[in-house]
């Protein structure tokens, strides 16, 4: 995905990230999987390390089919910010939580169905965690 697909990365941030060689969510994940990489990118771009970590977590979630922009934001608001975190969730509980959070914050047009969440969680269990803290 293009880097701008991550919620919160507009033209200004995208320009800074692209100048540092980060054009896609894959680039971001590769460069920022480790704390050292996030610190280096923060230094190079002037973007806070906290924000870079948030975006890296979203890029991590983008590895799951069906997760992108606003849905990654919704998952984060529901307490799931990484693939590693997603794999431990009970589908019915997560569905209730994202529905509740979306009703409250209106982050997505549509909340994924329970079967969709079940597939996402199953896929999360198969993916290797890539982010270190």
Give the predicted meaning of each segment.
Residues 1-133:
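C-terminal extensions
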């Amino acid at each position: 995905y293009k880097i701008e697909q991550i919620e919160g990365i507009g033209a200004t941030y995208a320009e800074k990230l692209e100048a540092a060689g980060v054009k896609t969510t894959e680039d971001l994940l590769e460069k920022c999987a480790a704390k050292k990489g996030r610190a280096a990118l923060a230094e190079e771009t002037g973007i806070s390390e906290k924000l870079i970590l948030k975006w890296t977590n979203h890029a991590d979630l983008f590895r799951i089919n069906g997760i992108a922009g606003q849905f990654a934001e919704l998952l984060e608001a529901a307490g799931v910010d990484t693939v590693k975190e997603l794999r431990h969730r009970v589908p019915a509980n997560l569905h209730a939580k994202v529905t509740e959070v979306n009703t409250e914050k209106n982050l997505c047009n549509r909340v994924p169905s329970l079967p969709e969440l079940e597939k996402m969680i199953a896929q999360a269990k198969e993916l290797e965690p890539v982010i270190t803290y």
